[in-house]
């Protein structure tokens, strides 16, 4: 397990840069969608997949091929960039593709990952499909996972609204295109601020071995007569 301490407010405008757990965003086609904009590990904006015709069970290639959906997600990302104070206007946000990250979230449901493994709803607490650099990510960036964990414990956030009842906030099971990721966030018991995020990662030994170091020769002591 990896713990990330004090992960929020990376840009100096607070955990919730707009001051709201969820904001109503009006798109250029007149559609209104609720989004959660959060600055934790990396500035991110989350939208419910159902609100924009998306599907969190879909493989990344299918999401990439849906030009209308990708255009909507990019519009949401640009508008969030301005609302979060990361860019002065939408044109500037176009050039700043790394942040904020934009992601669709949805409730747990049966899906098949990229390796062909089936995941039952009971094995997850929610699902995510994140866009990174203009493409649907084949898993989910670690920073995006950390942001999701923080948004999950913000009452009335879009993410919180997708989580299965009874889910453990310290061990959220996230359905991603490459399988299940477990992550959790904790609050400071005194201030209520998000104090740490924990993520479980796999590991394997890459190598082991020995290093031989030469030691200086021991001094020769004079022999008694």
Question: What is the role of each PLM region?
Answer:
Residues 1-225:
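Non-transmembrane, aqueous-exposed alpha-helical and coiled segments at domain scale
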């Amino acid at each position: 397990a990896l713990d990330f301490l004090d992960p929020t407010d990376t840009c100096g405008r607070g955990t919730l840069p707009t001051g709201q757990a969820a904001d109503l965003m009006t798109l250029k086609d007149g559609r209104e969608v609720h989004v959660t904009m959060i600055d934790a590990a990396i500035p991110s904006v989350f939208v419910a997949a159902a609100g924009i015709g998306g599907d969190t069970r879909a493989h990344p290639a299918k999401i990439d091929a849906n030009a209308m959906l990708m255009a909507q997600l990019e519009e949401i990302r640009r508008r969030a960039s301005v609302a979060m104070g990361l860019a002065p206007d939408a044109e500037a946000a176009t050039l700043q593709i790394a942040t904020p990250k934009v992601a669709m979230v949805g409730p747990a449901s049966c899906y098949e990952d990229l390796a062909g493994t089936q995941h039952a709803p009971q094995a997850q607490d929610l699902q995510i499909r994140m866009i990174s650099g203009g493409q649907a990510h084949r898993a989910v960036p670690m920073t995006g996972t950390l942001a999701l964990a923080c948004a999950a414990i913000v009452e009335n956030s879009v993410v919180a609204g997708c989580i299965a009842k009874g889910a453990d906030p310290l061990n959220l099971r996230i359905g991603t295109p490459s399988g299940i990721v477990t992550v959790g966030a904790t609050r400071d018991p005194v201030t209520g601020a998000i104090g740490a995020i924990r993520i479980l990662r796999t590991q394997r030994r890459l190598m082991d071995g020995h290093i031989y170091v030469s030691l200086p020769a021991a001094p020769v002591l004079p022999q008694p007569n």
